[in-house]
């Protein structure tokens, strides 16, 4: 009987947090299914991590049913997942009324629909094997309505609520669910937002983190039972302030 391989599936794996998750999971895994739209970036990841883990590139656009279906099939074919990282996403800049409705619907599809569908596909296998880890990449913006794009923050707030609820539902199964809520990260994500009008120079230097720091904080928190992880002391303070403002609105 062949030995079961430790396997991870990471979406949005071609750059930024996704690529960094692949790098830091490589020493922990035998195989990583890396999902993204850019085939050339995935091939670079295959080469970079060849000495540590088998990286299986899966070119798919999770904004559509076909791309999500390809991921679900990969989960079935590659066996139980030990790690599922729902990281694929994009940001916009500006008020809701200034954005096209198509881009906002695409954001909901990618951030919410794709994440819950892949969780639904992975959990039965994880439960059967006695455990696993699900990391849903959320955002500090989930705690701060009104301080960022409305739909983006709302989708991330959904992921927080979903992750907390799922963690409760899965008590006793060995499956751990985490919503990772980073603030500003030096990645292409914020570079793309800068092209849309976001001014990164307005953000104090101490608010920025490296992708490696964020991923390290996420993986270090596994096993702690913490369903919400906010890397960075200042970010955690802002999250608490945002929650306090929401509670105050009830009065």
Where are these regions (language model features)?
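Conserved glycine-rich cofactor-binding loop
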Residues: 14-15
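Conserved glycine-rich Rossmann-like NAD(P)H-binding loop of the short-chain dehydrogenase/reductase
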Residues: 29-44
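Conserved NAD(P)H cofactor-binding loop of Rossmann-fold oxidoreductase domains
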Residues: 87-92
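Substrate-binding pocket helix/loop in short-chain dehydrogenase/reductase
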Residues: 95-97, 103-108
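Active-site helix of classical SDR
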Residues: 119, 155
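Residue(s) in the substrate-gating loop at a strand-loop-helix junction
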Residues: 139
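C-terminal helical subdomain
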Residues: 179, 199-238
């Amino acid at each position: 009987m062949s030995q079961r391989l430790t396997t991870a599936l990471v979406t949005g794996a071609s750059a930024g947090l996704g690529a960094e998750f692949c790098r830091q999971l490589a020493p922990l895994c035998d195989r990583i299914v890396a999902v993204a739209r850019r085939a050339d970036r995935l091939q670079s990841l295959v080469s970079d991590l060849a000495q540590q883990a088998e990286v299986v590139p899966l070119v798919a656009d999770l904004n559509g049913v076909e791309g999500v279906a390809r991921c679900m099939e990969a989960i079935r074919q590659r066996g139980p997942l030990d790690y599922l990282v729902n990281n694929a996403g994009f940001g916009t800049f500006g008020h809701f009324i200034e954005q096209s409705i198509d881009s906002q619907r695409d954001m909901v599809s990618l951030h919410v629909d794709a994440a819950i569908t892949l969780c639904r596909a992975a959990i039965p296998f994880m439960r059967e094997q006695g455990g696993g880890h699900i990391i849903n990449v959320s955002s500090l913006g989930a705690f701060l309505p009104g301080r960022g794009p409305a739909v983006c923050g709302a989708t991330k707030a959904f992921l927080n609520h979903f992750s907390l609820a799922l963690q409760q539902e899965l008590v006793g199964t060995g499956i751990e669910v985490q919503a990772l809520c980073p603030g500003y990260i030096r990645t292409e994500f914020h570079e793309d937002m800068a092209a849309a009008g976001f001014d990164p120079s307005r953000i104090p230097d101490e608010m920025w983190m490296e992708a490696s720091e964020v991923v390290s904080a996420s993986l270090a928190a596994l096993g702690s039972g913490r369903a919400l992880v906010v890397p960075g002391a200042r970010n955690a303070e802002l999250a608490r302030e945002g929650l306090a403002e929401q509670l105050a609105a009830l009065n």
